[in-house]
Amino acid sequence: MSAPMTLFADVNWQPVIDAVRQARSIVLITHCNPDGDGIGSQMALYDALIVAGDGRISMHNRDGVPRIYSFLEHSEQVQMGDWPSDAAKPDVIIALDCGARGRLGMPDEWFDGPTLINIDHHASNRLFGDINIVDARYCATGAMIFDLLIAMNMPLNKARASGIYVATLTDTASFRLASTTPAVYRMAADLVEAGAEPWPISVQVYESRSLSGLHIMTACLDTLEMRDDGRSAWVYVTDDIYRKTGADVEDTEGLIDYARSIDGVEVAVFIRSDEVVAERWKVSFRGKTCVNVGALAGELGGGGHVHAAGCQLTGTLDEVRARVQVAVSRSLSSF
């Protein structure tokens, strides 16, 4: 196997490497309701750091690890929930794939003292770290970890390759988005050579839906609304749908893609109720060709990428839908 080549050689990883080498304790964390990129990046970096450093390495996610990613090595090491108030603070916190500190779901005082390293590929990232490595050229944060490992002279193994492969697979919509450049395919080849197994990973990620997941899928699709002369498609999951189907937020993964797949649709909108806070809604956007949904989400206080983005809004469903409709129609009006 030839030595892997970095995707972007001009990124300066030295501040991260220096902070990691000097730290006695490090916590890796990703955003609330984590996705494949956050979890895959976390697992790959954890596997490297437990070998590279003498310090204590741990992982903590407010919402743990989604079931479909629990096959990744080290996933059982993730601590879940609020950070214990009596626990010692680490020297370094590494936030992965998170555009804003608030999305980590931890209290502000948790970040007082430790060096906070922010590694992310969202253009809307708020640069909340003491050290910020934020680069929207990358297709996934996992691809950034690939380059970081090369900078650390850490070889790929099956655990690292599998984590990065999951991160890249899920954040490129199975290598379909425009961010999937020739360099990304070359990276994928390096990952497979190092032990990542595309078909078993695909089965775990895409072919392991629970029965309740099927129920919520049919209930969600029953809510489909076509708007903007057929150029936007809207689907919903309410508290009532959660109760009737017995599903949870993990089971809603990918539902918005059915709306985007409709011929003629340029923007898909998925509005789901927050499982914890009443009248708080998570709004997801998916774009097809002409609309930058990252900019659309930014109008509503959120962010993301050109083809995938989101925000969080409060109010009744009708109020939220009305606000989103104005922004969607405005985005479509130029095309």
Question: Model features per residue range: what roles?
Answer:
Residues 119-188:
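Short alpha-helices
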Residues 73-131:
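Active-site cofactor/cluster-binding pocket
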Residues 36-42, 101-104:
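Short glycine/serine/threonine-rich phosphate/pyrophosphate-binding segments
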Residues 116-118, 132-133, 232-234, 270:
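Conserved beta-strand scaffold positions in the cores of enzyme catalytic domains, especially
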Residues 46, 74-78, 134-137, 286-287:
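Short, hinge-like loop/turn segments at secondary-structure boundaries
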Residues 2-32, 40-70, 84-90, 170-299, ...:
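Hydrophobic helix-and-loop "lid/oligomerization" segment in the mid-to-C-terminal part
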Residues 33-34, 98-101, 122-124, 239-240, ...:
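Short glycine-rich anion-binding loops that position phosphate/pyrophosphate groups of nucleotides
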Residues 29, 33, 95, 118-119, ...:
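Generic enzyme active-site microenvironment
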